[in-house]
């Protein structure tokens, strides 16, 4: 495993209240900009807005190690807890989180 290897992804499936998608996506982008380079093992993220369902957004985070990912998503992460509290009023329900092993990832620059 090299320093740039992405081995894990965390899917956060977010169900939003009507009209909240733009605000939520902006908040997520600002949050990731604020933690850029400060989170051990975080290799990147992507925000996906469902083109057929305005109330669904997916946030994927990419990780080198499961330990770093698990630490980030632990209850003790105050920055993540603060983000959740900020966007909670926008949620239709709390996000579903699923961990995936990354088998293959190819992004052409």
Please state what every model-predicted region is.
Residues 8-12, 21-22, 33:
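Short acidic/polar alpha-helix capping motifs at helix-coil junctions
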Residues 15-28:
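Short, surface-exposed ligand-recognition loops at beta-strand->loop->(often short) alpha-helix junctions
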Residues 30, 34-42, 62-98:
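An amphipathic, aromatic/His-enriched active-site/gating alpha helix that lines ligand/cofactor pockets
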Residues 1-6, 46-55, 83-109:
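Glycine-rich beta-strand-turn "strand-cap" elements at beta-sheet edges
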Residues 7-8, 24, 40-41:
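Short, flexible segments with low predicted structural confidence
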Residues 16-18, 65, 101-104:
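Non-catalytic surface loops within mature trypsin-like serine protease
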């Amino acid at each position: 495993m090299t320093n740039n290897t992405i081995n894990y992804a965390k899917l956060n499936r977010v169900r939003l209240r009507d009209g909240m998608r733009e605000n939520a996506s902006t908040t997520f982008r600002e949050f990731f900009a604020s933690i850029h380079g400060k989170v051990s093992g975080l290799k990147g993220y992507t925000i996906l807005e469902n083109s057929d369902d305005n109330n669904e957004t997916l946030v994927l985070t990419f990780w080198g190690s499961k330990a770093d990912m698990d630490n980030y998503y632990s209850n003790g992460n105050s920055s993540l807890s603060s983000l959740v509290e900020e966007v909670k009023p926008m949620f239709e329900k709390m996000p579903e989180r699923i961990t995936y092993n990354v088998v293959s990832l190819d992004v052409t620059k």
